Amino acid sequence: QKKDKKDKFYGLM
């Protein structure tokens, strides 16, 4: 799955 980028982005929020 290519969702790690978005996950990290939201994780920073």
UniProtKB/Swiss-Prot annotation:
Expression sites (tissue/organ): Expressed by the venom gland.
Cellular component terms per the entry's GO annotation: extracellular region
Localization terms from the record: Secreted
Alphabetical keyword list: Amidation, Pyrrolidone carboxylic acid, Secreted
Residue list for modification Pyrrolidone carboxylic acid: 1
Family: Belongs to the tachykinin family.
Stated name of the protein: Tachykinin-like peptide-X
Lineage: Eukaryota, Metazoa, Ecdysozoa, Arthropoda, Chelicerata
